[in-house]
Amino acid sequence: KFKSVQSTNNKSIKLIQKFKYSSGLVVSEIQTKGKGTMGKKWISKKGNIFITIFFKVDFTKYNIKNFLIMNVKIIKKVLKRYTKKNIIIKKPNDLLIENKKICGILQEVIEYNNDKFLITGIGINTFVAPFNKKFIATCLCNHTKKIINNLEIIKNIKNVYEKMINDLNNNNFTYVKNKYI
């Protein structure tokens, strides 16, 4: 866990390259240069969740597009524990409540030492809805009667991903896809 990083995805890549980690979770209280899709900036407001999950993947066995679908559905399922409101997937990688963005997911693949890694950055507006002229955002605390605890949400996400990675290592992809999609 970090107080501040430029981006959790970039920090993950550095951990892979410097320490040769094969998987991990990077959490930061703030990102100074958060990344969105197509080179856009992710607006990172303190109090929200900024994490990246990374792990080694054999892409000869798995289709990268399936991971994006799984990632979005995993996070949607975790967030549904906290709200009765309908959470909609805005393809390819955003989650919306009442047509307002609550979560964005950035998926990248890097190659290092002949291994490929899936880097999945997740930004969730839990307490602060950032202002953006291009889209309207919301935050989870505006759509729930439950107490929001970022560490609990991160732990829930981590647990699901640990199970998924274990399933990937011990089962065929059809099994994993059926379980998580």
Regions inferred by a protein language model and the residue ranges of each:
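Short, basic and Ser/Thr-rich N-terminal targeting/leader segments
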Residues: 20-22, 89-91, 100
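Long, positively charged amphipathic alpha-helical accessory segments at protein N-termini or as interdomain linkers
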Residues: 59-87, 97-181
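Residue-level marker for buried hydrophobic side chains located in beta-strands
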Residues: 26, 91, 118-120
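N-terminal lobe of the biotin/lipoate ligase/transferase fold
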Residues: 1-81, 85, 147
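Short loop/edge segments at beta-strand edges and connector loops
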Residues: 3, 89-91, 174
